[in-house]
Amino acid sequence: MVTALEARPEAAEIWRWLDEVPDPEIPVLSINDLGIVRAVDVGGDEVVVTVTPTYSGCPATAVISLSIEEALRRRGVTRARVKSQLSPAWTTDWISPAGREKLRAYGIVPPEGAACAGAAVRNAPQACPRCGSAHVEEVSRFG
């Protein structure tokens, strides 16, 4: 049985809760750090969280949705829905500054600035995330 919200949380509070939901592929990041949460809407007796996956076929999308729903249930939200929004497409530009720092410490340096400017644009990492050396090369566009 689906019941109404036990307590009507504010959207800002839900955003804070989502800071605790890790990305299943890179668990040092929250889904907020990654920038995939696009909107939180509290209306009536339902919370709707809109998510843009990092790519349209992302295999972690179902796990992320379940994790969001579980995080909300733990706080008394009994009616939640996760909506997928594919457009505009996610870019590394959406990663938060805190998320970029966490990735750097984890050994990953995502592209910076105008990531969607075009396929021909390739921004090499600025520095090695481990030692800070400027002698770096891109190893992989994906993962």
Language-model-derived ranges and their functions:
Residues M1-G143:
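Domain-level signature for proteins that mediate thiol-based redox and metal-cofactor handling
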